[in-house]
Amino acid sequence: MATPTNLVTNRGRRFKWAIEFGSGGSRGRGERGGLQDSMYPVGYSDKQVPDTSVQESDHILVEKRCWDIALGPLKQIPMNLFIMYMAGNTISIFPIMMVCMMAWRPIQALLATPATFKLLESSGQRFLQGLVYLIGNLLGLALGVYKCQSMGLLPTHASDWLAFIEPPERMEYTGGGFLL
């Protein structure tokens, strides 16, 4: 007849998930016998395995982050166009504040360009990313200047600069459908 230890040994071999807690003491892994090795899962190793996929995925994430920084100003242009449309061409405090902020953000970004280029140093395409960043900010600044010109805030006539020159006379007046 089978002894209880043989049953436990056979059970341990047959069911690898069964663990015998009754025998053994506080011995280390190197001192354990063949029976105690069944306590560790299949494929367990004491050695550390180097993972090269982590380094590769980190490089991909750095490139992606650098492109996000470079494309940031270009992503703001549709919102700036919407703000330009909503502000209208009238001169009041809110449209002027919106236009000033629209022009100030690219100026701030252009002044902080060296700090931004430091973030792009780890990228392999830093020249192209820096160029895209610069073009995006210049386009944002051009939108702000265009909006200032369409609101009449930029001096475009000689009478804007000199007090003794009369402003140009309008050739035509419209009144919105009312007879004047």
UniProtKB/Swiss-Prot annotation:
The lineage of its organism: Eukaryota, Metazoa, Chordata, Craniata, Vertebrata. Part of the endoplasmic reticulum membrane protein complex (EMC) that enables the energy-independent insertion into endoplasmic reticulum membranes of newly synthesized membrane proteins. Preferentially accommodates proteins with transmembrane domains that are weakly hydrophobic or contain destabilizing features such as charged and aromatic residues. Involved in the cotranslational insertion of multi-pass membrane proteins in which stop-transfer membrane-anchor sequences become ER membrane spanning helices. Keywords: Endoplasmic reticulum, Membrane, Transmembrane, Transmembrane helix. GO terms for biological process: protein insertion into ER membrane by stop-transfer membrane-anchor sequence; tail-anchored membrane protein insertion into ER membrane. This is ER membrane protein complex subunit 4. It is found in: Endoplasmic reticulum membrane. Belongs to the EMC4 family. Residues 1-63, 118-124 are cytoplasmic.
